């Protein structure tokens, strides 16, 4: 392993090859995926029988592997999304086996490919061309693009049935912003029908068509914990699966008699196979971690009948696995690369819970909250092994997400540099059901931030090997919002802060983010600024910029369209107006990341981020490991 005291370890970690978005060919003999084993993200195709990995692209696909790929119906080309240096204003391109690339759909806004007709005649995709994310089709013979839906709220997951006659998707036509319903329409978008599978206010959506197209696998959280079910188009009835003990969602049909579901418990995500004749289900026999099959509506079954999935743990990087449901045996199709490292070199995750009423012992400086309901909050602690160890509090993004027992490269970078890392699944996180997730509605900057601070207080009290004079908050996206908020709400707790692609001015965010983020994020959680101006101002970190009382590093991609770079610039201006000085010896530091949007998987861009983060922490609080 490289020395942990120089730049070699950062470069070695940033250079670890990463696979993304495995997608299965129509005949089940190949898997297309993004892989950066060459040092740059490229499209590769894996032969599942021989294990041969062939590189199709040579710089034509995006550097950042954020967006998924889909096979063409003939199995001789793959569709991918292409943007401009991470701005996510995707067009849809195709690449064939000899590396030839051509544009297929070029439109304003963001395009999101969701379905390829099995006869190869057309594509179905989402686009924000006209404002909101709606569904469109592209006809290969005529070259024409047709708008299929025109909803005020975003439409998600549109997918053609196997016979090409129907379209399944999810949207919301009710006045309840928390609601989502599953719909079926004719393939041209006509005759849309709400299946009305869940109660108003719950979230329901399609996951996969059955091979014969007569049934639809759906997910719904009406009972609180999510559940998977199979809807029969002929009888207009749904059969729900599972006993309701865990938060679950539908993944895909395996065949006509079995489906896969995803199950969240504590900080792990496991796959469950359900027998549709008996209703019995069992978890796949894999080590506890995170197992996933990739994009929805992409059956993960290869030609020999095995299920292909990605599996990872805190110390084992993602690998591609073929799992035999008949005997619960599995083999690795594509092993993870470790470079100069071994799995034992990485820090493992300890899962624990803490009781929180959303109000920590640390003084509240921005908004004074009364105690909320006391809830059990889950968290993960990564021990760097350094004694004493500085602590990095690392709230997740989303906010509709959670931290789990998977390999996290940023966490391992910090741990190898001697910083222990705390991740907190605050109220509002996923994996705990609808009620827990909805705790965050109308309360950004409230109890969820108190949960983060309470968990930090807990580990500092319980682990005497943590150095309470070297505590830093670091987060990206909504985690960046949390980093800003922690620094202005609980400045006494932290010795430095790092806010990456974070929100600072909620009204500016509302005005300048993409349309589907405006409705499905900002309006859903906070309402509209003109209807709720006080809340928008009160919960914006920039309102309290003068509360920053420790060195702050601000990082933001210049091409970010989810959280525009204006968010960082506004906070910088507020600090300067309050008399704060910028620079390595100043009160705050500021970096705009060129040719980058809302984070990046590109190896060079990751290394840039690692160096900025490592240098700031070393200068400002002292590296955990010299």
What are these regions (language model features)?
Residues 1-11:
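Sequence/structural signature of beta-propeller modules
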Residues 10-20, 26, 30, 34-67, ...:
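Peripheral, non-catalytic segments that deliver or gate enzyme domains
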Residues 351, 421-423, 590-592:
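Conserved beta-strand scaffold positions in the cores of enzyme catalytic domains, especially
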Residues 390-391, 420, 472, 496:
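Short, Asp-centered acidic motifs that coordinate Mg2+ and/or phosphate
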Residues 394-397, 423:
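Structural cue for short, hydrophobic secondary-structure segments
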Residues 418-433:
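Conserved alpha/beta-hydrolase
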Residues 429-626:
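Active-site-proximal cap/loop segments of hydrolase catalytic domains
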């Amino acid at each position: 392993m490289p020395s942990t005291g120089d730049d070699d370890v950062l470069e070695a970690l940033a250079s670890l090859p990463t696979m993304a978005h495995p997608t299965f060919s129509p005949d089940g003999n190949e898997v297309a995926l993004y892989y950066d084993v060459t040092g740059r993200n490229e499209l590769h195709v894996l032969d599942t029988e021989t294990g041969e990995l062939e590189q199709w692209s040579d710089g034509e696909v995006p550097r950042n592997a954020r967006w998924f790929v889909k096979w063409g119906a003939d199995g001789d080309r793959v569709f991918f999304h292409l943007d401009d240096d991470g701005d996510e204003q995707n067009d849809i391109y195709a690449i064939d086996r000899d590396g030839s690339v051509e544009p297929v759909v070029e439109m304003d806004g963001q395009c999101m490919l969701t379905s390829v007709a099995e006869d190869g005649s057309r594509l179905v995709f989402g686009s924000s061309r006209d404002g909101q994310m709606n569904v469109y089709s592209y006809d290969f013979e005529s070259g024409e693009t047709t708008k299929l839906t025109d909803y005020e709220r975003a439409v998600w997951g549109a997918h053609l049935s196997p016979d090409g006659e129907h379209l399944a998707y999810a949207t919301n036509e009710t006045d309840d912003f928390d609601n989502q319903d599953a719909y079926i329409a004719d393939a041209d978008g006509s005759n849309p029908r709400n299946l009305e599978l869940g109660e108003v206010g719950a979230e329901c959506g399609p996951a996969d068509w059955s091979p014969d197209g007569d049934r639809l696998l759906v997910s719904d959280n009406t009972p609180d914990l999510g559940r998977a079910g199979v809807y029969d188009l002929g009888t207009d009835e749904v059969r729900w699966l599972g006993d309701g003990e865990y938060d679950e969602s539908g993944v895909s049909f395996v065949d006509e008699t079995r489906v896969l579901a995803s199950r969240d418990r504590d900080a792990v995500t496991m796959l469950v196979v359900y027998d549709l004749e008996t209703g019995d289900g069992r978890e796949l026999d894999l080590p506890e971690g995170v197992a996933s099959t990739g994009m929805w509506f992409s059956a993960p079954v290869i030609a020999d009948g095995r299920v292909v999935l990605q599996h990872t743990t805190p110390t084992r990087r993602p690998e591609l696995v073929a799992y035999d449901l008949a005997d619960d045996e599995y083999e690795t199709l594509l092993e993870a690369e470790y470079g100069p490292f071994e799995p034992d070199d990485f820090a493992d995750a300890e899962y624990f819970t803490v009781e929180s009423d959303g109000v920590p012992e640390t003084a509240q400086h921005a908004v004074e909250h009364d105690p909320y309901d006391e809830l059990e909050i889950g968290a993960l602690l990564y021990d760097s092994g350094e004694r004493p160890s500085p602590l990095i509090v690392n709230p997740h993004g989303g906010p509709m997400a959670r931290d789990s027992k998977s390999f996290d490269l940023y966490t391992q970078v910090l741990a190898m540099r001697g910083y222990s890392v705390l991740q907190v699944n605050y109220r509002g996180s996923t994996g705990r059901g609808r009620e827990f997730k909805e705790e965050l509605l109308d309360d950004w900057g409230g109890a969820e931030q108190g949960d983060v601070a309470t968990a930090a207080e807990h580990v500092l009290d319980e682990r005497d090997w943590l150095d309470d004079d070297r505590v830093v908050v670091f987060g990206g996206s909504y985690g960046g919002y949390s980093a800003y908020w922690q620094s202005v709400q609980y400045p006494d707790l932290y010795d430095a802060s790092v806010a990456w692609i974070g929100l600072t001015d909620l009204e500016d965010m509302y005005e300048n983010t993409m349309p589907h983020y405006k409705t499905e994020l900002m309006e859903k959680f906070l309402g509209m600024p003109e209807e709720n101006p006080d809340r928008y101002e009160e919960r914006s970190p920039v309102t309290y910029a003068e509360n920053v009382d420790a060195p702050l590093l601000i990082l933001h991609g210049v091409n970010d369209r989810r959280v525009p770079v204006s968010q960082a610039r506004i906070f910088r201006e507020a600090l300067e107006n309050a008399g704060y000085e910028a620079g390595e010896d100043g009160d705050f530091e500021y970096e705009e990341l060129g040719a980058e949007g809302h984070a990046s998987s590109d190896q060079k861009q990751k290394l840039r981020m690692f160096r900025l983060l490592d240098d700031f922490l070393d200068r400002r609080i002292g590296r955990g490991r010299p």
